[in-house]
Amino acid sequence: MWSANLAFEIVFDPEALKDLKKLDSPIQQRLIGFLKQRVATLDNPRDIGEALAGSKLGNYWKYRVGDWRIICAIEDERIVVRVLRIGNRREVYR
């Protein structure tokens, strides 16, 4: 969880932490760096994300980092980006 000098706080759900720990360290660092440097510093994290379509995923956003996807819920009232899942683009939506 990060919030110092950032517009939005990044919070990981337990499932997302499990996803992250399964990845190699360089990939973990790349994804964490993206969240810290690109997403958390924005006044509106929707500016670089993409809304997910569909009944189950309609309220969520995705961020693309190479072949990896970060699925998030943006909670404006709490100024939080909640990371729900992290995974390869072929598997993360299952």
Regions found by a protein language model. Name each.
Residues 1-61, 67, 75-79, 91-94:
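Basic, Lys/Arg-enriched alpha-helical interface segments
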Residues 70:
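NAD-dependent ADP-ribosyltransferases
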